Amino acid sequence: MNILRIACRSFHCLRCGPLLNENRGWSSKKIIKLVNKSSLSNKEFTEKVRDGTKDIPEWKKQKMAVRKKLQGQRWNPPKKISQEQMEALRLLKFNFPELTASDLADRFKISPEAVRRILKSNWKRTDEENNNTYERWKRRGERIKEMYQRKEDADFVSNQIVTSRKIILGSNSNSPELIARNVRTFKPFKPNNSTPEKKNTNKLYILKHLGSKQ
């Protein structure tokens, strides 16, 4: 049974804001043309590209080489742990020698072979390296604190962006080209503060109001 896989992408057309210099938003045809131009189609991947035969950007050649190397598999690089986690792994193994490499691998979310390499390694950080790491993390914490203080004082840029249209693009497995599946138009919300407040005509409110006057 063939299962049709549809991949949809959403793009927002902004009529104002710092993201666009034009006064009006992009049309759906222009967005589709831009996405199709920057995408790597299946036809380009299946064809044999030789030097000098086709004018293909370098980034497309690299992407095709990576896809050919993976052979259709998902890119899943091995996980790396920090030096602090390595020290914690060695300390855990020293205190609990009955733990196997598989147990430690499940705990730290790495492969058992990586656990064996870490335990066999005799490398340790010196006192100077520990002090440098401490000072680096201290400076990083100060920068993060300053960044949050600036955000509290300044307005967010996202509040200045008005979204007027949302174009939903889609493609199927038979054709690599994208098509516009839906276009939604949003009206900006304008609070009307000039309208007078309506008087409450509830009977309980009127009786309470008359009782307070007496």
Swiss-Prot record:
Provide a GO CC annotation, any one. mitochondrion
- Where in or outside the cell is it found? Mitochondrion
User: Which keywords has UniProt assigned to this entry?
Assistant: Mitochondrion, Transit peptide
GO biological processes: mitochondrial genome maintenance; mitochondrion organization
InterPro entries per UniProt = NGRN/Rrg9
Point out the transit peptide region.
1-18
What else does UniProt say about it?
Answer: Present with 1160 molecules/cell in log phase SD medium.
Q: What does this protein do?
A: Required for respiratory activity and maintenance and expression of the mitochondrial genome.
Sequence similarity = Belongs to the RRG9 family.
Report what the protein is called.
Answer: Required for respiratory growth protein 9, mitochondrial
Task: State the organism named in the record.
Answer: Saccharomyces cerevisiae (strain ATCC 204508 / S288c)
Query: Source gene?
Result: RRG9
